[in-house]
Amino acid sequence: MHPGGRYLQYADGRPFFYLGDTAWELFHRTTREEARLYLEDRARKGFTVIQAVCLAERDGLRVPNAYGDLPFADAGFTRPNERYFAYVDEVVATADSLGLVIGLLPAWGDKFCLKWGPGPEIFTTGGRAEAFGRYLGERYRTRRNIIWILGGDRPPEGRELILRAFARGIACGVAGREDYSACLITYHPWGKSSSGDWLHDEPWLAFNMQQNGHAYDFDLWERIARDYARRPVKPVLDGEPIYEEHPIDFDREKYGTSEALHVRRAFYHEVFSGACGHTYGCHAVWQMWEPGRYAPVTGPVRSWRESLSLPGAYQVCYGRELIESRPFFRRIPDQGVIAGDAGWGHGRCTATRDSLGTYAMVYSESGRPFAVDLGRVSGKRIVAWWYDVRSGRPLRIGEFRRRDAGATMTFTPPTCGKGNDWVLVLDDARMKYPPPGRCPEARSGAAG
């Protein structure tokens, strides 16, 4: 945790941008060859976290993994099966070798709060939850590539004692005592909510996680801003935004299927509103769906292998590159960068900047023109760029003197309309920042 309380960092102090991918069924449905193929792809693209579940959503207590192993060796679900967890070990180790962190859910939410799904609800007492948490904590105590995620698409209300027991068990397993500084723990809630709605003051909750519920017409920035304003200060991110190629609001006939624009929209509005990172998801990938092998859940469009190269998977990585190309820990949300109307809905513009004013960024979802308060950027001379969020390419607008531009300046993105979203980057020329993003000579698989 960075001392400022807004961002995550590596143990050596380097910035850690949480760029997650959703692979809930990774341990449950893949072979080791498939897991390696998937993890190598995500590492190559630039993801930093893979979210996966030990006791999986898709009937993970009664349907065995790809090698025929169930997670428990007894019908009472009390004795972990070493063969099952040895495979989890192997996948976690493979991820570590590729520089990936595993966002590890001990169990999907139906295992402690049924509401829907196959269950069964096996964690009905604090003792059982603490014992399983301790088992996993001890098993992975030497691993440095794990972030713990409790929950799993359920509200925590009424289950607070169970969650405290899970967290206590994990901490005691990792550190030998109830020391929450030894392990990062968060909570994955159900749709259109945040862990902060219930759990913000829990000592075990290191940062807040949200889920938007796979809707499109959703004011993403407001919920991030709400968690950003909570005290004590804790980082926040969306751990389940709308998945790429997911039925929008679970109603394909009425709203269609999500695409790369929906992915980008969630990323930029939320990160620019103060999120410490973001999670991407693809509808086929989270369930590791292959035709003829598993029953599909709400109609994936193509297999998980084909889905690895969807445009949104590249484009969130371009977003990470943009954020990391400027001073990381000083970044703050600031709608004051936008002079006048910031817009609403799909015409929204969202701004972020350096707290010292050496750079500012504005995301225009529909490519509409907007005015900038130049007083929010330091320096007598300012360098301006457009960042193409579809390709990760920067386009230099030019350099100008502040006194010639006046107090405000209007910028018109190169294109406009649905799917023509852009980021404006303004730099204090004295800083000599490089072009925004990673600036490769060419990109592939990114258009869309």
Identify the residue ranges that each predicted region occupies.
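Short strand-edge motifs at loop-to-beta-strand transitions and within beta-strands
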Residues: 407-409
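Active-site mouth of glycoside hydrolases
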Residues: 3-219
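Short hydrophobic alpha-helix segments
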Residues: 19, 398-400
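Aromatic- and carboxylate-lined catalytic core of secreted/periplasmic carbohydrate-active enzymes
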Residues: 14, 244-246, 259-398, 413-445
